[in-house]
């Protein structure tokens, strides 16, 4: 068998259904849209959430909450991600962005205690969880809130 003799397995490729190409095709005349009505017209159809004139669910339910304009979202770094740095490294937010550990700094960096830390590091971040502080200090490293 040669490359030009390869054939797709039977039934693995679905043939595109061309509508409006004669009665014999099975999808001629109205092209599977039925007779008249909003859904038969070009550009026709109802908007998402429309329930035929009945008050839609999203309007029947009460509004809840608000968006806090002062919300701070922190970029999360876990302990096991810090293992990629050499012993004695000073880990700063700039270094974390540069090495691709976090994509962008957002409102700051928060170090969480997931995973285990194997290196002695000086970590500078905006926030630390209690378990992260414990793990960093246990390895002889230091943490600094900036």
From Swiss-Prot:
Positions of the UniProt region annotated as Disordered: 1-56
Biased amino acid composition, Gly residues: 21-35, 42-52
Biased composition (Basic and acidic residues): 1-13
GO CC, alphabetical: cytosolic large ribosomal subunit
Pfam family, one: Ribosomal_L27A
GO terms for biological process, alphabetical: translation
A GO term, aspect molecular function: rRNA binding
Complexes and interactors: Part of the 50S ribosomal subunit.
Function of the molecule: Binds to the 23S rRNA.
Alphabetized HAMAP family for the sequence: Ribosomal_uL15 (MF_01341)
Family: Belongs to the universal ribosomal protein uL15 family.
NCBIfam families, per database record: rplO_bact
Alphabetized PANTHER family for the sequence: 50S RIBOSOMAL PROTEIN L15, LARGE RIBOSOMAL SUBUNIT PROTEIN UL15M
Name of the protein: Large ribosomal subunit protein uL15
Name of the coding gene: rplO
């Amino acid at each position: 068998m040669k490359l030009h003799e390869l054939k797709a397995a039977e039934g693995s490729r679905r043939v595109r259904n061309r509508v409006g190409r004669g009665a014999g095709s099975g999808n001629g005349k109205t092209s599977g849209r039925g007779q008249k009505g909003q859904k038969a017209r070009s550009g026709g159809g109802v908007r998402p959430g429309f329930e035929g004139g009945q008050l839609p669910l999203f309007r029947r339910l009460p509004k809840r909450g608000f968006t806090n304009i002062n919300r701070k979202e922190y970029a999360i770094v876990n302990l096991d991600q810090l293992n990629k740095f050499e012993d004695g490294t000073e880990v700063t937010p700039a270094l974390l962005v540069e090495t691709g550990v976090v994509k962008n700094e957002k409102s700051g960096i928060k170090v969480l205690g997931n995973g285990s830390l194997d290196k002695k590091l000086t970590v500078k971040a905006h926030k630390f969880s209690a378990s992260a502080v414990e793990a960093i200090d246990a390895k002889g490293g230091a943490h600094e809130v900036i």
